[in-house]
């Protein structure tokens, strides 16, 4: 277990690092009135000190540490992050508001007085779209009461399952019930999503018999908390993947696997996989569990056959989700840009050398982008990033992976097999993006979901 024997020493290091990076970003941004930045420095300094002190008193209960750290820094993030400034948060928030009404599915309906279709929501939700990127200090939209006048938006992530927005929907519903200002729909939606993420992570770390500290490190990455403290369902997806991985660690170490735990593992895998299909491959982790750990031969066989069940559910959902994906601005975009999964596959089959080249780009071009996404905050319009910090995080992870010692480590054979599953999932993520987002023949340039990828690595 990693311990902070001298908390004063680490508090000093934290204060020094925070000061250096604050000065660096202040210099780059050239703030004329840095009063707010000074205030945030003080808040982060206090939050960091409290976190270090709490860790020193609870370093044997890392699930509690994770819960506290995620909530503390998540609350800071959810209030500071500008309106709709998380990737695709506009659409995520529209879906959250729809779910808050009790509508678990979505209806793609004609927009009155137009020839277009869209999703029915309320005026306050679409008003925020005009103030995207603004914070509460430079817009008055947050001062308005909730406007329930029907409004329409062209996309609502209809391809995502409803459970990805239940927590956010509860927050939006509560803001409506309490008749709060409109901004509280966004803030409470973010807050309940954060609580769900923190709760699942706490359960995951508590369940894992080994590698608790690495799971803690991955779960509190800035990009992880940034996503969790938004209305995006990506935070839930990451939490479910980490939960599934923690149950694998439990299976690997327990002398007798319970049916209940096996069921929870597959539920986590399926729920995660329906949000991001390639992660259904997490079910393959069951092959890394020693056969002697299953209660009997029957359980061993059923556990492995359940992989086919998970795959079948994933394929069935993907067929439905693909049709829903076109019911948005993406439908017209795909037509204009000639984006077609079947067309892309035919193109690659007809050009095997290009297919090999594209596969190579997954590692030569996309992998550096994944590393850069360790510190990348964007909604595709406004970007806040730092290659320096991304590089430092990558170096930290490399050093941590090499020097972190655990007396109950996984053996080399299991690590090799786990690495192959990581390669399969990573390649699957890149392949799905290539087939569904890029036009025919375009180079592989996209990369995402570095939180879970870093966990598996």
Enumerate the predicted regions with their spans.
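Short acidic/glycine- and proline-prone juxtamembrane loop motifs at membrane-interface regions
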Residues: 34, 230-237
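Membrane-lumen/periplasm interface segments of multi-pass, membrane-embedded glycan/lipid transferases
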Residues: 319-406
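Perimembrane helix-loop-helix junctions
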Residues: 45-46, 247-255, 280-312, 410
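Specific aromatic-rich, kink-prone transmembrane helix
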Residues: 49, 203, 236-254, 267
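Membrane-interface alpha helices of multi-pass inner-membrane proteins
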Residues: 226, 261-277, 282-288
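Start-transfer (signal-anchor) and selected internal transmembrane alpha helices
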Residues: 2-75, 303-311, 414-419
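Interfacial juxtamembrane loops and adjacent helix segments
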Residues: 101-188
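Transmembrane-helix signature of polytopic, membrane-embedded enzymes
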Residues: 7-11, 180-183, 201-222
């Amino acid at each position: 277990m990693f311990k902070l024997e001298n908390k004063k020493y680490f508090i000093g290091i934290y204060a020094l690092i925070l000061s250096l990076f604050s000065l660096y970003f202040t210099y780059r941004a050239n703030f004329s009135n840095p009063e707010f930045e000074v205030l945030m420095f003080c808040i982060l300094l206090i939050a960091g000190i409290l976190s270090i002190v709490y860790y020193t008193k609870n370093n044997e209960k890392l699930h509690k540490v994770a819960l506290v750290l995620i909530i503390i820094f998540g609350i800071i993030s959810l209030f500071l992050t500008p309106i709709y400034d998380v990737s695709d948060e506009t659409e995520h928030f529209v879906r959250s508001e729809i779910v808050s009404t009790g509508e678990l599915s979505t209806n793609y309906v004609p927009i009155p007085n137009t020839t277009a279709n869209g999703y029915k929501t309320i005026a306050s939700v679409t008003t925020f779209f005009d103030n995207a990127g603004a914070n509460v200090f430079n817009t008055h939209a947050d001062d308005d009461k909730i406007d329930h006048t029907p409004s329409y938006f062209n996309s609502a992530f209809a391809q995502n399952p409803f459970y990805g927005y239940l927590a956010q929907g509860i927050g939006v519903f509560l803001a409506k019930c309490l008749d709060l200002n409109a901004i509280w729909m966004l803030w409470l939606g973010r807050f309940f999503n954060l609580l769900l993420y923190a709760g699942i992570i706490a359960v995951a770390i508590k369940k894992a018999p080994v590698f608790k500290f690495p799971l803690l490190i991955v779960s509190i990455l800035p990009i992880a908390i940034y996503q969790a403290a938004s209305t995006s369902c990506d935070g839930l997806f990451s939490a479910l993947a980490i939960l599934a991985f923690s149950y694998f660690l439990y299976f690997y170490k327990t002398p007798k696997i319970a049916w209940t735990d096996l069921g929870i593992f597959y539920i986590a895998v399926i729920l995660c996989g329906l949000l991001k299909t390639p992660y259904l491959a997490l079910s393959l982790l069951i092959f890394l569990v020693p056969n002697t750990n299953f209660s009997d031969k029957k359980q061993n066989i059923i556990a492995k056959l359940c992989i086919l069940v998970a795959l079948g559910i994933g394929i069935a959902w993907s067929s439905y989700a693909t049709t829903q994906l076109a019911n948005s601005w993406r439908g017209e975009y795909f037509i204009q840009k000639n984006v077609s999964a079947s067309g892309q596959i035919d193109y690659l089959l007809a050009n095997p050398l290009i297919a090999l080249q594209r596969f190579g780009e997954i590692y030569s071009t996309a992998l550096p982008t994944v590393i850069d996404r360790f510190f990348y905050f964007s909604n595709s319009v406004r970007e806040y990033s730092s290659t320096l910090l991304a590089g430092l995080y990558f170096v930290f992870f490399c050093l941590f992976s090499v020097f972190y010692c655990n007396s109950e480590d996984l053996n080399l054979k299991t690590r090799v097999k786990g690495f192959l599953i990581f390669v399969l999932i990573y390649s699957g993520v890149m392949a799905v993006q290539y087939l569904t987002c890029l036009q025919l023949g375009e180079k592989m340039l996209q990369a995402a979901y570095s939180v879970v990828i870093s966990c598996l690595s």
